[in-house]
Amino acid sequence: MDYATHYDVGDRKRDGGINEDSVAVSVFEQGHRAGFRGYDRDGAAGANEAESNDAEDPDDGADEGDAPEAEPPVDGESDRGESEADEAPPDGDPANRSAAVFALADGAGGHDAGDAASYIATTAVCEHLAGTVVTAARGDPAGFDLAVDEPLATPPRDADLESAVAEAVVAAHREVLEYAADAGEQAHATVVAGVVVGGRCHFGWVGDSRAYVVNAAREEILPLTTDHAVVQRLREAGEVDDVAALVHPRSNEITRAVGGSGRADPETATVDVETATVPLYREDVLLVTSDGLVDAQTEASKLYEWYVDAGRDEEMAAVVRDRAVTDDEIRDEVLSAASLSDAAGRLVDLANDRGGKDNLSTLLLHDGTLPPTPEDPPARAAGTRTAVEERETRVQ
């Protein structure tokens, strides 16, 4: 598994602001015997997962080709050498099996300690989930052509891992509240966090930071999250269309966050964490980002007024799309990049080119050992997929 991160204060805040975003990722890698043979080798690991999950879907993505040699990290950029492992290894070459925990948080700048909130959130989430991801990977030895029963635990199901993510975010929420109470400050942050293991991503979120899948085989971008935000509520109510949402003047208002003023009891306080699970494929790049990527336009309010005054006509809609950052542009930047680190940097540059209104951060992950994208993949975008508790049991 390869990953890259990039984070930036944003052009508008460069001379006087601070970066209140925080990104954390922890990758567990294991090599054994002749190397990891993948999740689709004779159906081995997939069948193991189906059996242990009451026969839930054992879902099986174009290689980027020869990526250029990785450059040293600079200015808030990290790059874990995707030049070698970004492709699925040829038959016979040893490969490591990978799993990961990730968390991205965006501190609320309108409050006293957003930077502390985001730091606490990302570190707390990863601390709580580190053991979970190793346990999940350890319980599935079939990818190494190995059959072990006792003493290995049965691999956790999708619902178990989603619950673990939610519990980690709630734990982070309580830690931020404890900090706020001790410091006498308000501390809020949005969070996107998850576990990538067994060819699946189990994730949860609070607020308007986002997760996407960009798939090279189908040349598409799939939003995995829906914003917990005022503008999203207006969209769902039919009061705001997709173009207006790009530049809406209330784009900075969220309806859910971790942390608070410290008045809530840190021992019992909770937050509603939305969770989901999706399969990942060889051609996928998992992208996690703060809202600074998509809410970058410093003249958003003016563009919104022009669009509304023009009767929301298509000509003005095209102007808005051209000046805002759209999902299609994000897809194109990722697919045309030479490497994950190149993509991460290009996304930050894109947001700054459009105004750089806020702090922005990106995390991209790719696993070349995964199965290729099937011809008819399951629905993965937010609003189209089936909740884990509603999936029908399948016999493979």
What is each PLM-predicted segment?
Residues 1-396:
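PP2C/PPM-type serine/threonine phosphatase catalytic domain
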